[in-house]
Amino acid sequence: MKSSAELRKIFLDYFRHQSHEIVPSGPLVPANDPTLLFTNAGMVQFKEVFLGREVRAYHRAASAQRCVRAGGKHNDLENVGYTARHHTFFEMLGNFSFGDYFKREAIGYAWELLTEVLKLPPERLWVTVFKEDDEAANIWLQEIGVSPERFSRCGAEDNFWSMGETGPCGPCSEIFYDHGPEIEGGPPGSPEQEGDRYTEIWNLVFMQYDRGKEGRLSPLPRPSVDTGMGLERLAAVMQGVHDNYNIDLFRNLIAAITALSGIQNQEQTSLRVIADHIRSCVFLIVDGIQPSNEGRGYVLRRIIRRAIRHGHKLGLRDPFFYRLVEPLVQEMGEAYPELFRLQSQVERVLKLEEERFNETLEQGLKILEQDIIDLSDAVIPGETIFRLYDTFGFPVDLTADIARERKLTLDMKGFEQAMAKQRKRARAASRFKIEYGSELQMDLETEFTGYEQLRGEGQIAALFRLAETMETVEQLSAGESGMVVLDRTPFYAEAGGQVGDRGTLRGSNGLFNVTDTHKQGAAHVHLGEVRLGQLRVGDSIQSEVDRKYRTPTRLNHSATHLLHAALREVLGEGVIQKGSLVASDRLRFDFSHLEAVQSGQLRQIEHLVNAKIRANLPVETQIMPLQQALDAGVMALFGEKYGEQVRVLRMGDFSMELCGGTHVDRTGDIGLFKIINEMGVAAGIRRIEAVTGEAALSWVEEGEVCLEALMGRLKASRNSAVDKLEQLQQQTRQQEKELQRLKAKLATTGGADLSIQAQEIRGIKVLAARIDGVDSKTLRATVDQLKGKLITAAVVLGTVVEDKVVLIAGVTNNATSRIKAGDLVNFVAEQVGGRGGGRPDMAQAGGRNPDKLDAALDLVPKWVEGQLTSGAQ
């Protein structure tokens, strides 16, 4: 019996021998594709190649691609655990042809691998083709020799694939495995096809058409092939099991969960859910996703919390999910070495998320259980779903999971209405910023010369005027704002976090002031205003970058690379860049880290960066193939799209990253690096802001001026200033304590005097009074003192603090059956525009109308008498 790891290797080795380039799995975060939450198929990393927008050095490829289907259009989350073949994470084995081989070879490869290499019996395989694809049908029936009795033609719904409403598309051919007549279900294309007897294991897509806007299909000049075979499904077939959760990959994970829970029934849904979810969660975190409340991070949080809830069902009340990382690493680490490297980081993320959710899970489940008991029908109300989501962090699919187990449904319309109300409450006025060139389409290319020089000659290739919209023009005149596209330029276009250059474009008839530079496709777009004369398309231009703006930007960009490397050295390899801003006045770097960076760590990071600056390391760039760079250990950012050839930036042996930005020649050019701020920007994301060069020197000098002023005020030296300040703080704290003691003593004395004002009503001494000049703490102490003195009493005291009413009510324990402190304090609070609450014996409230306090307190005896009278009846 072959293991999943062996099957993965057999597949890739087979296609390597068929002259395919073996391409490593792309990240789970698709590069530059906002239409996808996650990579969900093997072809995703080749999408630009299939669309003809990217050219690679090879024309045939194969890969084992990590995929996630959870959230968005492709969402298997709700079915995971309940079926034999649904997963949030899976591996897609695929071979691809980019205008090289087509149907005959693709079909031949698939059949040979399945029947001759893997030795699957042909009589257990079933083949389908698109009903109109006679070419594929003839290859299968006439050349391969598939039996007509194990072959069917199907409609477009099952056997015609499209990338979208328009673009590349074509028929597909699917290969199914027959598990035998003892399993219910009929062959593909039959009325009984929904059964489990026949399992699709390989899909061969033949991209041979281009669908136009009108729906017309035109033949592609170079047809391509995209195939996909789920490793888990193949393993189930090869290991003789009908259920994916019985393959080796899952058996070992389920055994680990069983060991933690003590549950021996390995068919339990919860075991399967947890085993599936640990795979997707670990790989998402490895690929740089952190749990959060939006986008991909929220999908990860939903998966984690669903797993935790199923652990709760198994009796696992303490954090357990993170303990499954190690068995997963042992299972898949050989194929994906990054699992070993980032294991501790992943464990920390999962443990922290689990601890956070455990705080509210129990409480939320109790509320849901009570609401289910109170149901008048089989529908959980939308308000309940929203309350669990908003207050207790229950993703909707977690509530749906529980409903499914109880044979209940969800009022999703009511939930959406509650969500809409919340969004309306939270909606703030916003302005839409016009993005220059955001909707422009241009087929232009600019040669960038700015690595070597800040001046250059070029020719105007296109002009755009900014009116209500951006419009193409032949001429721009003085006072007009717009964009200039040159055939070559030294101006750096904003990318990789580095801001675009500023400067001037000077022609024989005009001067253009550049305020920013952006990239539109392959063109550099200069934004700004004509200051003198006019510019025309075709004019020769003298370009000059603002040196005072570019130079500090270069310093900051190089310092950002040093900072990134220093963070990974000090905090660990779990640090992953999440964003950056490289401007002329500062740099900003966002990175994954679960907690605030300690002050000692910040000093260590800063010292390390400055040590590398003093070392004056050479800053070198080299153009090389992407895979060569990755093999050399170059850091690449998840979610970034790179071409086949990349620019590698090296700073000695300390830092090596892919980068297209502008940099110093040696690290010593940076001069000085100073961290000025560290803060959190989202769950698991920290931000460091820093300055370099002259800006760093100015920051230090400003600090010196402040320190000297402080020393003067304290009448202390540099070395004694901190001690002197601590002494003053200690004195202040002691004086504040003494002040509070005196206030309490004064209030207690006043309380003794107040006790004589109490009037007895039906056996309870009632006192309502105002005490000025005290805080809530003193007021509470006075109420306690009066309760002790009056024996059987109801007391409410009020004061005014910063124009707000503070009320404290107290009722002795022997009277709480007749009157409640919460009711008493709320009665007074309503008179002064507020409300409050608390225990039957002690409650607190506030109010907005201090001028009504005295009148409100005067009403207390009558209110108490009414309460006692009604209670007696």
UniProtKB/Swiss-Prot annotation:
Which transformation does this protein catalyse, written as a reaction?
tRNA(Ala) + L-alanine + ATP = L-alanyl-tRNA(Ala) + AMP + diphosphate
Per UniProt, the keywords (alphabetical) are: Aminoacyl-tRNA synthetase, ATP-binding, Cytoplasm, Ligase, Metal-binding, Nucleotide-binding, Protein biosynthesis, RNA-binding, tRNA-binding, Zinc
InterPro entries the record matches? aa-tRNA-synth_II/BPL/LPL (IPR045864), Ala-tRNA-lgiase_IIc (IPR002318), Ala-tRNA-ligase_IIc_anticod-bd (IPR018162), Ala-tRNA-synth_IIc_core (IPR018165), Ala-tRNA-synth_IIc_N (IPR018164), Ala-tRNA_ligase (IPR050058), Ala_tRNA_ligase_euk/bac (IPR023033), DHHA1_dom (IPR003156)
Q: What class of enzyme is it?
A: ligase
Report the main location listed first in the record. cytoplasm
Keyword presence, Metal-binding: yes
Query: A GO CC term?
Result: cytosol
Q: Which cofactor does it need?
A: Zn(2+)
Family note: Belongs to the class-II aminoacyl-tRNA synthetase family.
Quoted from the entry, the domain comment is: Consists of three domains; the N-terminal catalytic domain, the editing domain and the C-terminal C-Ala domain. The editing domain removes incorrectly charged amino acids, while the C-Ala domain, along with tRNA(Ala), serves as a bridge to cooperatively bring together the editing and aminoacylation centers thus stimulating deacylation of misacylated tRNAs.
Indicate what this protein is called per its UniProt record. Answer: Alanine--tRNA ligase
Gene that this polypeptide is encoded by: alaS
